[in-house]
């Protein structure tokens, strides 16, 4: 019985931390991007993260060779941005920051994985959060 209480206590302490995540407002999974045009990445901070200390993010893209996409934990691909993330309040829309990048002509057409890597400090926890999107270019 004490073991169950211990597990419940650990779960209640860990659950709020695991729920702390950032979101991608754009682009969305399956978006088609055109070579020679700019695209905007919108990184959203949910209100539940208002007390989190932001360290930084990286935004990267990797081609899927022969239909096989690399795992973002193994390969980031071309890093488009690595640095501070400072979301600001917008009405409506909450807290977010936009980043704009070009799709250059040397980028291979076809599916690609876009990776948002997030590092933040939540209390005494050190957490990295990774999200990925599949793009068709």
Which residues fall in each region the model found?
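Residue-level recognition of well-ordered beta-strand positions that form the cores
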Residues: 42-44, 60, 102, 117
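Fungal secretory targeting signals
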Residues: 1-23
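Short loop/turn segments at connectors of secondary-structure elements within structured domains
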Residues: 18, 51-53, 108-110
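Short structured motifs
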Residues: 24-29, 81-86, 98-101
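Internal, hydrophobic beta-strand segments that form the core of beta-sheet-rich folds
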Residues: 96-136
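N-terminal edge beta-strand
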Residues: 17-44, 49
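Contiguous segments within soluble domain cores/interaction surfaces
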Residues: 38, 45-91, 129, 134
